[in-house]
Amino acid sequence: MAQAVDASKNLPSDPRNREVVFPAGRDPQWGNLETPVNASPLVKWFINNLPAYRPGLTPFRRGLEVGMAHGYFLFGPFAKLGPLRDAANANLAGLLGAIGLVVLFTLSLSLYANSNPPKALASVTVPNPPDAFQSKEGWNNFASAFLIGGIGGAVVAYFLTSNFALIQGLVG
């Protein structure tokens, strides 16, 4: 097996000898690498359409979208996998747990905002990072909207889970 790999080094036409990882922009001084994953058009499209990098959004709108997603998906593990999962009020415990974690995340974001974070650097995946996170005010707007969105997302998940039988009866 090792013989075949060694022999392929002598054949420039062998596909195993093609370089697939390059320095970003072909400049090794950048300290970033272009790989088949992070330089693919699909990954670039996906990353650049996330709320953190989507162009034209205010920091408040970014925080609201990110918070809603986090609040919504944090509810489930607390409600269905937590220590009160078999209790009658498991959904309420899940709601309170998700809200508590969103509050802790918001405090962490506020602390980070007040620590003078460095400016976002351009990378292979995100060539034009948004300027929404260049100031304390932008980060604090993001954090306050994250709190509102996170609590809202957890409440929506709570109502959907608590009223599942009613929703199922309405739909069919």
Swiss-Prot record:
Membrane topology: Multi-pass membrane protein
Localization: Cellular thylakoid membrane
Keyword terms, alphabetized: Membrane, Photosynthesis, Photosystem I, Thylakoid, Transmembrane, Transmembrane helix
Primary site of residence: membrane
GO cellular component terms, semicolon-separated: photosystem I reaction center; plasma membrane-derived thylakoid membrane
Alphabetical list of Pfam families matching this protein: PsaL
Residue ranges, annotated region (Disordered): 1-24
SUPFAM superfamilies xref list: Photosystem I reaction center subunit XI, PsaL
Transmembrane segments: 92-112, 147-167
GO biological process: photosynthesis
Position of the signal peptide: none
The organism's place on the tree of life at top rank: Bacteria
InterPro entries: PSI_PsaL, PSI_PsaL_sf, PSI_suXI
Parts forming coiled coils: none
Family annotation (PANTHER family): PHOTOSYSTEM I REACTION CENTER SUBUNIT XI, CHLOROPLASTIC
Family indicated by similarity: Belongs to the PsaL family.
Entry-linked HAMAP family: PSI_PsaL
Protein name per its UniProtKB record: Photosystem I reaction center subunit XI
Gene that this polypeptide is encoded by: psaL
